[in-house]
């Protein structure tokens, strides 16, 4: 009841506004009278009155501009206040606009008292011609308007008999009356009462929620059916094993009592054991009386799967390919780009994919090792949207692979081309989001980070993040992840300090965004930039600690720990030596040991498809572009340098969203630590928190006067080397600080917890060779997992917010 009383006046005002809008005057009088009797106060100045006054003001301005012949003012107001849908689809609005264009075109001829302003007259006629060629072209087939298409070409329209009517005062007066009537109806419809707006929004939201729930229901039912089948299978196998076990126990007891086990009995037991994997006749044909046969078959059924040799793709004529990519027609370019991308995305991880990538690099497919004006990178500026998109997708695949990032970093003009393409593309285009993904992956390379910071890309990203609701989930995640990677550098933090107030406001707003997957990147960026004293002071002055503590109440335990670290950073007094660039100056190592990460939906929703007689994919490459000995293969060392960062701590190393998801997946799938380990970690964390107000590093609390967070991040260690100073992290090898653990524990745990994607493991399974003893039987036994996998799905919610993926 208290809630109703609190909002009662507003609710009564909404009802009053709606009744007034619908012209229910008698009902409104009765309603007002009854409210007065019951002591209910109606708002004196309702939203309706304000809207009505605003509508009248707009209408007055339009009529004034009409009478004065002010064409610019009139059509500026017209475009602003008349809905676009009404302008494009309403026949009354289209006809009225046509006559209004005529009115303004001949206005100087009607109002001139003597000398005519020829310049003004020519400008108006030119404007009218432009209208006839664009918006007015739709009415060119209408008999009523057909004569007026000759108006701009008549030297003296006032003297022409065909246009005599429009120069009469009655015509202008009638047009003004039609305009007033139209504006009163349209502007009133535009000022919809709040009650109707609330109803429409609620209805729209309910429909969206219903669709989401229906989709979730279908997925859940499908999973339930799958799980039920698995359960029934497991239950059947379990009962079968219990029965076989009971029979074997009876046999052992009989053996103790001196009874012999017959071959027929052993045959029946083995047949029951293998009945699920083998046909009955096949199982009965095997000689189980031979010693070791049954046990060998059992062991073989759970033996690790052996991988077959994967054939390499044929060599290509890359010179001809690059020539056709530059000078061919747009459709051919698109098919070539698609086929080259498919070679990478549809190849088997390992030798086959590495050979394809090395062939692209050694033959300089993207012209990253040369700086000719006419190279493949000009396709990013192609007038064809399909070519631009497919070019970006091919570069994105290369940027998803460790060697590919090294190769792309060799061209200093590539970054400039990518940034220009990103800025030039429309906000909801696939090409724009793909280019954003490329920039984010390239930000794993220290040289590319430096170039991006130098080009002030940080401020572009901040402007993008000002309005996150207009970004798809994919664009939002990759934008904030790129921003965080750049903020981890000393130069990036310095740049943020120039506009600290703006940056902090944008990040604090993102803390409350409904997409919780971005919280880790927001936390990492905040923690990093708060190392700068000037930014800390700005954050304190705007009450950042109160904002953060409010989110602690709302967040999950992991995020709460992140925020606690950020608050410690905010309240610290550590100095930030701007002259020290130790981590920025250190030599960058190639990230060849990084795990490669190909996103799952790179080949979804292909725009072009081969028609009858056209070649595409591998068939196109091997038919028209077959080469000789252009493949080169470099053995790629797999060094799982990544360690799992503590879930308590904000990100402090460059990551991609796919790598972060992989890290979280591994953390969730890993076994829970024992109580003893938990106690040990808790005690270590307590000791560290007592010794320093800053988040601890593996070397303890740092000196507050000289070390920066950059140097803290650069001292991270891997299972293979405790002095690894690489500045970039592979998309599937997150190598971030582990909090509160001894070195040997971190090393051991990191070897066991290797980030990988369950989806990709299924997608990249190889054909298996049949063991020499017997076929593989068990499909549920222990399997040897292959670690050469790509990252998990990028969850490109482009599809959730954009028409092309929606």
Swiss-Prot record:
Keywords, in A-Z order: Cell projection, Cilium biogenesis/degradation, Coiled coil, Cytoplasm, Cytoskeleton
Pfam family, one: CTLH_Armc9
Acidic residues bias: start-end ranges: 579-604
Listed Low complexity bias regions: 689-708, 783-806
InterPro entries membership: ARM-like, ARM-type_fold, ARMC9, ARMC9_ARM_dom, ARMC9_CTLH-like_dom, ARMC9_LisH, LisH
Subcellular locations according to the entry: Cytoplasm, Cytoskeleton, Cilium basal body; Cell projection, Cilium; Cytoplasm, Cytoskeleton, Microtubule organizing center, Centrosome, Centriole
LisH domain ranges (all copies): 7-39
Primary residence: cytoplasm
Function noted in UniProt: Involved in ciliogenesis. It is required for appropriate acetylation and polyglutamylation of ciliary microtubules, and regulation of cilium length. Acts as a positive regulator of hedgehog (Hh)signaling.
Protein name: LisH domain-containing protein ARMC9
Organism: Xenopus laevis (African clawed frog)
Lineage, highest ranks first: Eukaryota, Metazoa, Chordata, Craniata, Vertebrata
Gene name of this polypeptide: armc9
């Amino acid at each position: 009841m208290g809630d109703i009383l609190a909002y009662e006046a507003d609710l009564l005002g909404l009802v009053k506004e709606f009744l007034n809008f619908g012209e229910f005057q008698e009902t409104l009088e009765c309603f007002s009278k009854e409210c007065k009797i019951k002591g209910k106060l109606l708002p004196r100045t309702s939203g309706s009155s304000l809207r009505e006054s605003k509508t009248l003001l707009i209408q007055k301005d339009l009529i004034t501009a009409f009478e004065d012949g002010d064409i610019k003012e009139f059509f500026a107001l017209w475009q602003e206040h008349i809905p676009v849908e009404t302008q494009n689809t309403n026949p009354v609005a289209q006809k009225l606009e046509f006559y209004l264009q005529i009115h303004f075109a001949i206005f100087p001829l009607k109002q001139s008292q003597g000398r005519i302003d020829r310049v003004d007259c020519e400008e108006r006629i030119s404007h009218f011609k432009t209208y006839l060629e664009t918006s007015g072209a739709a009415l060119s087939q209408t008999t009523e308007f057909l004569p007026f298409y000759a108006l701009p070409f008549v030297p003296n329209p006032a003297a022409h008999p065909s246009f005599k009517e429009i120069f009469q005062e009655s015509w202008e007066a009638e047009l003004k009356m039609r305009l007033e009537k139209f504006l009163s109806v349209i502007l009133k419809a535009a000022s919809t009462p709040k009650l109707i707006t609330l109803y429409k929004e609620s209805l729209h939201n309910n429909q969206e929620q219903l669709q989401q729930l229906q989709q979730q229901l279908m997925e859940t039912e499908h999973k339930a059916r799958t799980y039920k089948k698995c359960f029934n299978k497991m239950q059947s196998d379990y009962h079968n094993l219990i029965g076989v076990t009971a029979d074997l126990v009876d046999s052992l007891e009989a053996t103790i009592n001196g009874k012999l086990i017959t071959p027929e009995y052993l045959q029946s037991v083995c047949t029951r054991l293998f009945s699920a994997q083998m046909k009955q006749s096949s199982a009965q044909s095997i000689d189980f009386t031979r010693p070791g046969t049954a046990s060998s078959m059992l062991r073989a059924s759970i033996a690790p799967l052996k991988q077959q040799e994967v054939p390499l793709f044929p060599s290509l004529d890359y010179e001809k390919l690059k020539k056709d990519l530059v000078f061919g027609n747009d459709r051919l370019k698109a098919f070539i780009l698609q086929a080259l991308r498919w070679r990478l995305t549809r190849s088997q991880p390992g030798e086959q994919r590495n050979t394809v990538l090395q062939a692209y690099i050694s033959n300089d497919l993207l012209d990253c090792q040369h700086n000719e004006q006419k190279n493949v990178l000009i396709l990013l500026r192609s007038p064809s949207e399909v070519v631009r998109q497919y070019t970006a997708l091919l570069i994105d695949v290369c940027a998803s692979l460790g060697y590919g990032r090294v190769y792309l970093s060799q061209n200093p003009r590539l970054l400039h081309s990518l940034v220009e393409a990103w800025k030039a593309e429309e906000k909801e285009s696939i090409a724009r989001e793909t280019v954003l993904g490329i920039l984010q992956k390239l930000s794993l390379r220290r040289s590319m980070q430096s170039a991006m910071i130098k080009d002030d890309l940080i401020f572009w990203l901040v402007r993008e993040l000002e309005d996150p609701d207009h970004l798809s989930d994919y664009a939002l995640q990759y934008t904030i992840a790129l921003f965080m990677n750049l903020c981890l550098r000393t130069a990036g933090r310095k740049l943020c300090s120039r506009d600290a107030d703006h940056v902090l406001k944008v990040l604090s707003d993102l803390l409350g965004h409904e997409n919780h997957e971005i919280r880790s990147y927001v936390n990492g960026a905040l923690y990093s930039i708060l190392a700068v004293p000037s930014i800390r002071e700005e954050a304190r002055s705007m009450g950042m600690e109160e904002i953060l503590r409010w989110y602690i109440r709302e967040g999950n335990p992991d995020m709460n720990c992140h925020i606690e670290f950020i608050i410690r950073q905010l309240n610290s007094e550590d100095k930030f030596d701007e002259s020290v660039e130790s981590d920025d100056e250190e030599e960058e190592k190639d990230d060849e040991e990084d795990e490669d990460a190909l996103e799952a939906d790179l080949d979804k929703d292909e725009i072009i498809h081969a028609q009858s007689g056209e070649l595409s994919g591998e068939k196109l490459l091997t038919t028209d572009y077959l080469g000789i000995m252009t493949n080169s293969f470099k053995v790629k060392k797999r060094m799982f340098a990544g360690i799992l960062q503590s879930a308590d701590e904000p990100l402090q190393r460059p990551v991609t969203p796919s790598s972060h998801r992989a890290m979280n997946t591994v953390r969730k799938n890993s076994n829970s630590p024992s109580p003893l380990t938990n106690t040990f970690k808790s005690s270590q964390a307590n000791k560290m928190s007592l010794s320093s107000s800053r988040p601890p590093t593996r070397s303890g609390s740092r000196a507050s006067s000289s070390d920066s967070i950059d140097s803290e991040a650069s001292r991270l260690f891997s299972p293979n080397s405790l002095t690894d100073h690489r500045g970039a992290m592979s998309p599937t090898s997150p190598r971030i600080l582990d909090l509160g653990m001894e070195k040997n524990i971190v090393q051991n745990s990191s070897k066991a917890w290797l980030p990988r994607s369950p989806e990709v493991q299924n997608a990249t399974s190889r054909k298996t060779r049949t063991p020499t003893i017997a076929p593989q039987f068990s499909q549920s036994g222990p399997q040897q997992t292959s670690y050469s996998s790509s990252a998990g799905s990028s969850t490109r919610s482009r599809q959730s917010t954009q028409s092309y993926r929606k």
